[in-house]
Structure formats: C-alpha cells, structure tokens
Amino acid sequence: MLNPSIERKLEGLVERYQEVQALLGEPDVISDQNRFRSLSREYSQLEEVVGCFEEYRQNQDDQAAAKDMAEDDDAEMREMAEEELKEARKAEEELENRLQLLLLPKDPNDDRSCYLEIRAGAGGDEASIFAGDLFRMYSRYAEKNGWKVNIVSASDGEHGGYKEIIAHMSGDGVYGRMKFESGGHRVQRVPETESQGRIHTSACTVAVLPEIPEAEAVEINPADLRVDTYRASGAGGQHVNRTDSAIRLTHIPTGVVVECQEERSQHKNRAKAMSVLQARIQRLEDEKRQAEEDSTRRNLVGSGDRSERIRTYNYPQSRVTDHRINLTLYRLDEVLTGDIDLILDAIITEHQADQLAALSEGQQ
C-alpha cells in the first residue's frame, strides 16, 4: 500500500491535471502562446504520473474483488482468486516503485539546453590535447542524441586541443544528462612526445550550466558591466583584421569574465557572451543557496570545481573510472567515441536512489 501522504499528493496531482486539461480548452489560453505552451508542458508532465496512479487504483479494485472471490464456496473459484491476488500484488509493487520515481523532485532546468565549458588544467600541452578529446567525446554524444553543438569561444592549445572551449548544446533534455559531467576529469596516458614511455597524468575541468530563458535570466545592471572589444583571432580571412568584432564582458561585482569571437557580428558575439555570463552568475547564486541549505547528502551533480575529481581515463588499461559511484569500466574506446550513457545511466540510477532515500526519510 502507498504511504497515505504520497496518496494525498497523487490525488492533488489528479485534480491539477483535470484543471490544466480544462484550461487548455479555453479561448483566452489558446490565444496566449506562452501560457498555452507552459500549460501544455505541465499537462504532458502530469499525464504519465496520473496514468500510473489510475493503474494503481484499478489494481486496488482488482485486489478487493479477488479477496471477495477468495471467500467463495467453490474451491476452483478460490484457487483462481488466489492466483489473481498473487499477480495483482506483484503488479502493485511495480506500480508503487514507478510512482515513487515519478514523484521525485524534478530539476526545472533538466529539459533545457546548456553551456559546456572545458578548461585545460595541470599537465601543460597534454591537458590541452585532453580537453580536445573531451570536447570530441561530448560532440559525438550530442550527435547520437540528435542535439546541436555550437562553439561560443575557443582558445587553441599550442600543440592541439584547447586551453579553453565553451560550447552551446541544444536539444531536448540536454542539461538533465550533461549536468552530471561537471567536475574534474583526469587522464593517464603516454604522450606522443614521451620517448621513455612514461605515463603522464593531466587534468581538465568541465562545467555544465543550464541555459536560462531570457524571461527568467538574472538581471545585470549595465553599470556593473565592463565591455571590451578587440579583433578576433583565428580563421576568418581578411575580415578579422578589419573589425573589432570580438567581445569581452566583465561582471565587476563577481569578477566573472566571458569572451566571444566566433561570430563575425559584434552584436551576435555580445548576445552569446551575455547568455553565458547570465548562466554563470545564476550558477554562483545557486551554489550560494545550496551552501546555505548545508545539505549533508552527497550531490552527484558536480559543481565544476577543479578540486572535485569525478572521473579518470586510463589509456594503457583502457579503463574509465567514475569516482562518485565507484564504477570502473574497461571500455574506454566506446566512452571516448560518445557512449557515455554507459556511465551516465548508472549515475542517474544512483542519483534517483539517493532522492528516494531522502523522500522516505521525509515521510518517517
């Protein structure tokens, strides 16, 4: 049987589902595109949990009918009732588990696109090369999922890869999966320039920030912003020598700096840089709030802090280890070609288990 508090919550969701269903048929809602889109999204989110709850209620009715039948004078009917009751109880357990997962608190950012930031850390040129490997891995993962990747800014490494690269990843549910990639990534391998065959260790930092819609973005006082323009470097032919199209935004109160030079238009570069800046400031505010809440439960969503090592890629052993859940796979080639769901599926399962534990603690 479901916990009474969970059942009350589900009944409230059924009422809201019916309310949203009625609202979607009203002319003033249909004519308001933003409201209609918002309610449609809420309706589709409620639909699955309400459908599952209806199955659960039907299951309870089936069990009650089977219990009545189990008291019949006919032995054959009693045997049939016992079999039905056994099957219904098994289905009840599965439905309860499904409902609990559907009721887990959802991150409102999960369905959003995101900004991916990769920075080379310790290890010099080898760290920059590894940053390039990570970006290629994420690009292939995005391709497998039908997501789009656009580079916002990039600083090339001297011998390949990137000292820093920022990209925009767009598609359904991008942030919900990519957010688990934030943190320190370490590589152990023999560099091509190493004549003695010694294994070197290098590191990169990955930060994943949700793209905040303009209507919800943090307001930035223009007086708090320093804007610098400069000539773009890299590909672009003569154009890069003629115009100061590159933009550097500095948010003075926080010291956050964002550069963008990928577009030929200064206006477009500024818009992209502002979106990244707003995402970073939002992240700072979220981290501050989280610290104030002082959560004692582990958080599998990384902060992007370089000191927070989340994964090691060992080339000689073809091994990849995720330190948050002590998962080791000897399938490095598959992971590097974009099959990171091998790791992410396990992390998300663990994350949901942590949330379920917190949910049950709150009901005790």
From Swiss-Prot:
This is Peptide chain release factor 1. Belongs to the prokaryotic/mitochondrial release factor family. Keywords: Cytoplasm, Methylation, Protein biosynthesis. Pfam families: PCRF, RF-1. Disulfide bonds: none annotated. Its main location: cytoplasm. Gene3D superfamilies: 3.30.160.20, 3.30.70.1660, 6.10.140.1950. PROSITE patterns: RF_PROK_I. GO terms for molecular function: translation release factor activity, codon specific. It comes from Idiomarina loihiensis (strain ATCC BAA-735 / DSM 15497 / L2-TR). The lineage of its organism: Bacteria, Pseudomonadati, Pseudomonadota, Gammaproteobacteria, Alteromonadales. Residues 286-297 have a biased composition (Basic and acidic residues). Peptide chain release factor 1 directs the termination of translation in response to the peptide chain termination codons UAG and UAA.
